[in-house]
Amino acid sequence: MVLSQRQRDELNRAIADYLRSNGYEEAYSVFKKEAELDMNEELDKKYAGLLEKKWTSVIRLQKKVMELESKLNEAKEEFTSGGPLGQKRDPKEWIPRPPEKYALSGHRSPVTRVIFHPVFSVMVSASEDATIKVWDYETGDFERTLKGHTDSVQDISFDHSGKLLASCSADMTIKLWDFQGFECIRTMHGHDHNVSSVAIMPNGDHIVSASRDKTIKMWEVQTGYCVKTFTGHREWVRMVRPNQDGTLIASCSNDQTVRVWVVATKECKAELREHEHVVECISWAPESSYSSISEATGSETKKSGKPGPFLLSGSRDKTIKMWDVSTGMCLMTLVGHDNWVRGVLFHSGGKFILSCADDKTLRVWDYKNKRCMKTLNAHEHFVTSLDFHKTAPYVVTGSVDQTVKVWECR
């Protein structure tokens, strides 16, 4: 590249200033003579430190160029492997991609839970503002608010048909809502403290709940009566989730354990105790993932010939653990989050795990290689909850920043 006469003159003066101000007197006088420079004080001021400034700005720009090049390469790779026009990925391998499709505002306090409806193109969010909101995830439209709780709504759960919605709250109640008429049809009292988790059992006849009163209770949907109480946790029970056939329930607690209970007998079948802090969340592995898990972990197929069941747990110790419930063994620990893990679940294709945490990220894990394969900076504040649609390519997240975000997978 050829410099113009003016640029050459400016460069020479900047070099002369650099030589003089750094004490290279001899080199300065030779250079000044050879470059035929007529130095005067006014001009000197203009070129003082100019060479160093140019040099540092070039380095800064080089760094920026390298960052942009790496982002461009990543985008190209994503476009060819996952973009709508590139080579088609198997839907089982679709993962959430930034940016979000929608960022939905409306809650006036942190969002505590987000879930998809099993049938319609809606999702539901619960919040510390004591409300439940319904949104259309395809259009991003707000549909309605369900009001009835008098304190933070902690968890929500649909039955398999999506006709009933259960919610639980720090107001110590569990409510059952008719999701067709959007009316509260039953309120259940019985816990002595904040009810932190609720789930409708797969058969739709019973609801299970967990509380800060250290108990897990089972309720009859038809009557609202409490029919069973499971005791054993020594601290606040954070979450409770039934397995696919409803014969087992898993729970996690501030006592740093995960427990698995036999519903019929109320017996604690397993106590899983390798976390080093409060266990915030749990999730059962779908049967579609059993073969991938067995392959990844080398776990034995039992006498029954069936592997599993398998369970995931996420903790304030910043780790995610995978457990073989039948043996009580921890099969793997995934490390990567920089803060409390608040939500964890299996990808519907069975090959990946998704998690969210107080480090404001949503992460996708390739558990076969025990590595985090994608990190999305999902929210401005802690990410409290996530859900993965069973059939449509969407993930939803909720946050302390009061927003709900919809992420498209491809």
From Swiss-Prot:
Substitution effect: residue 149 to R: Abrogates self-association and interaction with DAB1, dynein, NDEL1, PAFAH1B3 and RSN. Also impairs localization to centrosomes and microtubule plus ends. Reduces protein stability
WD-type repeats, residues: 106-147, 148-187, 190-229, 232-271, 274-333, 336-377, 378-410
GO biological process terms held by the UniProt record: acrosome assembly; actin cytoskeleton organization; adult locomotory behavior; ameboidal-type cell migration; auditory receptor cell development; brain morphogenesis; cell migration; cerebral cortex development
Tissue specificity field: Highly expressed in brain, particularly the hippocampus and the olfactory bulb. Also highly expressed in testis, including all seminiferous tubule cell types, all types of spermatogenic and Sertoli cells, and meiotically dividing and elongating spermatids. Expressed at lower levels in heart, kidney, large intestine, liver, lung, ovary, small intestine and spleen.
Boundaries of every LisH domain copy: 7-39
Domain of life of the organism encoding this protein: Eukaryota
InterPro entries: Dynein_regulator_LIS1, G-protein_beta_WD-40_rep, LIS1_N, LisH, PAC1-like_LisH-like_dom, WD40/YVTN_repeat-like_dom_sf, WD40_repeat_CS, WD40_repeat_dom_sf
Outcome of substituting residue 15 to R: Impairs self-association and reduces protein stability
Residue list for modification Phosphoserine: 109
Subcellular location: Cytoplasm, Cytoskeleton; Cytoplasm, Cytoskeleton, Microtubule organizing center, Centrosome; Cytoplasm, Cytoskeleton, Spindle; Nucleus membrane
Listed result of changing residue 31 to S: Abrogates interaction with NDLE1, NUDC, PAFAH1B3 and RSN. Also impairs localization to centrosomes and microtubule plus ends. Reduces protein stability
Positions of the UniProt region annotated as Interaction with NDE1: 1-66
Subunit details: Component of the cytosolic PAF-AH (I) heterotetrameric enzyme, which is composed of PAFAH1B1 (beta), PAFAH1B2 (alpha2) and PAFAH1B3 (alpha1) subunits. The catalytic activity of the enzyme resides in the alpha1 (PAFAH1B3) and alpha2 (PAFAH1B2) subunits, whereas the beta subunit (PAFAH1B1) has regulatory activity. Trimer formation is not essential for the catalytic activity.
PANTHER family linked to this entry: WD REPEAT-CONTAINING PROTEIN POP1
Name listed for the protein in its UniProt record: Platelet-activating factor acetylhydrolase IB subunit beta
Species this protein is from: Mus musculus
